[in-house]
């Protein structure tokens, strides 16, 4: 008997991975969000972006798409708004999925911090809301880390060193109501709380080694799949690559697993995947939560497959159909896997990229490789969605015996791809191929190499982005004492952390 899986806000990885894993008799319905891309609303393209589809209306449109078909499961690997829409649609269809309220609370960086303080207070930095509309000063001592309550690719997240610096940064967020509107609308519908669309979160600055702890919850039990190291380009917040398994000491990883398990069990998160970004300060031994994502980390799906033998999309499909997943360990073809980001810190014109046939030929040389291209010929790197600090133009994920073997393969693959980038201030086209492993980024056992294009200087761009017209606003006191939620007995602590 055929079974149908509904994929909400389908991504390019969904289209790539799911057909490879699908059992016979499984069909997919791929849903696309009926709106201007939300990402555009927090970039320089915001002024040209159209209106955002009402998320509550989108739920009804998705149900109309389904029609009378029987749905065996609902999934989404999309961060925003996909995971929240999927939880809401699954609830309506009566199939397993995380609770919509818990999903939304995790997605809202401020409300998530409130719940973290309830369950794992020792892993939470000082935090407070900032009212953008009134231009209030930071209630925390500088330096602070300023974040929107929701974002993509860390856009808008930056270290602020003074009141003067804060005053410069705040105006751009005053007119971005449309971006925050879907989350605020759904929070009111499913959690009975609204923080409004003109608030940012200030946090104490975290230092150390960044990792992602990923796991799943099924039948009320939380299981951890793995810990993935995040390696940054030196002196930046830009990811260079993601390494699995983590090189952190086993004892540190065990503490992180305990924090993640306590947090997700305390929330009552169930029937889904999650990933929690954490920071480990080697000097103090402190473990801190950066943020909780109530979804799978799709970029890591094939890393687990390479090392453990189980693609995390398989776990997602099993849970969505009400089946207990089986995540085996260290049964893959490789001892190590990495996902390397092709990134520049200056803008380039894209002259040429490899064809699909070129990538297929590369896969015959390096089995199990995954190549993603985010650059298009005839366009500048800055024309694509970027973080405002650098220019990502591709991802190469592969396995190896160890880190050195994987990086050697990566360098060879990058050269084989033959991506041609032209400097904007010159006419000759020069292939950007050779990667220099001179620079060092902090690693678990001292240092590990970070991949930096030869001759590319770190020169971040900071474009001021004009926002879209406001569409919805509601007021809520900028405090986190007494915040109450509609279900699950969730209540914020009766004190203000970091004030």
Question: Which role fits each region the language model picked out?
Answer:
Residues 126-127, 144-175, 184, 210-212, ...:
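Glycine-rich phosphate-binding loop of ATP-grasp-fold ATP-dependent ligases
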Residues 1-102, 131-134, 344, 376-391, ...:
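ATP-binding N-terminal substructure of ATP-dependent carboxylate-amine bond-forming enzymes
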Residues 254-276, 294-351:
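Active-site "cap" helix and flanking loop/linker of ATP-utilizing ligase/carboxylase catalytic domains
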Residues 87, 91-156, 171, 175-190:
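A conserved helix-loop-beta module that forms one wall/lid of the active-site cleft
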């Amino acid at each position: 008997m055929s079974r149908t899986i509904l994929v909400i806000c389908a991504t390019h990885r969904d289209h790539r991975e799911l057909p490879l894993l699908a059992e016979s008799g499984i069909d997919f319905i791929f849903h696309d969000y009926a709106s201007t891309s939300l990402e555009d609303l927090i970039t320089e393209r915001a002024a040209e972006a159209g209106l955002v589809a009402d998320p509550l209306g989108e739920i009804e449109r998705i149900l109309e798409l389904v029609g009378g078909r029987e749905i065996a499961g609902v999934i989404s690997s999309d961060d925003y708004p996909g995971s929240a829409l999927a939880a809401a649609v699954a609830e309506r269809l009566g199939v397993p999925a995380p609770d919509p309220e818990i999903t939304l609370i995790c997605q809202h960086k401020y409300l998530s911090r409130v719940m973290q303080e309830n369950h794992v207070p020792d892993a939470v930095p000082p935090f407070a809301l900032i009212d953008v509309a009134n231009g209030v000063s930071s209630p925390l001592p500088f330096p602070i880390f300023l974040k929107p309550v929701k974002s993509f690719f860390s856009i808008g997240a930056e270290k602020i060193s003074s009141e003067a610096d804060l005053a410069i940064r705040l105006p751009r967020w005053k007119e971005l109501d449309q971006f925050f509107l879907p989350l605020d609308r759904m929070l009111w519908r499913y959690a009975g709380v609204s923080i409004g669309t003109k608030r940012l979160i200030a946090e104490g600055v975290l230092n150390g080694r960044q990792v992602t702890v990923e796991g799943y919850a099924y039948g009320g039990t939380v299981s951890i799949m793995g810990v993935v190291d995040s390696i940054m380009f030196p002196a930046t917040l830009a990811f260079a690559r993601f390494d699995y398994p983590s090189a952190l000491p086993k004892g540190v990883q065990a503490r992180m697993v305990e924090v993640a398990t306590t947090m997700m069990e305390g929330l009552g998160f169930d029937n889904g995947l999650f990933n929690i970004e954490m920071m480990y300060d080697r000097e103090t031994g402190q473990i801190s939560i950066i943020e909780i994502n109530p979804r799978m980390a799709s970029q890591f799906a094939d890393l687990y497959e390479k090392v453990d033998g189980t693609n995390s999309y398989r776990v997602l499909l099993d849970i969505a159909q009400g089946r207990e997943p089986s995540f085996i360990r260290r049964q893959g073809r490789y001892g190590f896997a990495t996902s390397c980001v092709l990134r520049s810190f200056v803008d380039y014109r894209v002259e040429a990229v490899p064809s699909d046939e070129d990538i297929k030929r590369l896969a015959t040389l390096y089995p199990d490789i995954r190549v993603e291209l985010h650059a298009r010929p005839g366009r500048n790197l800055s024309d694509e969605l970027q973080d405002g600090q650098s220019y990502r133009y591709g991802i190469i994920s592969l396995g190896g015996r160890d880190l050195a073997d994987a990086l050697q393969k990566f360098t060879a693959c990058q050269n084989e791809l033959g991506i041609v980038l032209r400097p904007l201030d010159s006419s000759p086209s020069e292939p950007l191929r050779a990667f220099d492993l001179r620079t060092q980024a902090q690693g678990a056992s001292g240092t590990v190499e970070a991949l930096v294009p030869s001759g590319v200087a770190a020169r971040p761009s900071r474009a001021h982005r004009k926002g879209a017209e406001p569409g919805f606003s509601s007021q809520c006191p900028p405090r986190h004492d007494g915040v109450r939620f509609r279900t699950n007995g969730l209540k914020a602590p009766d004190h203000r952390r970091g004030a």
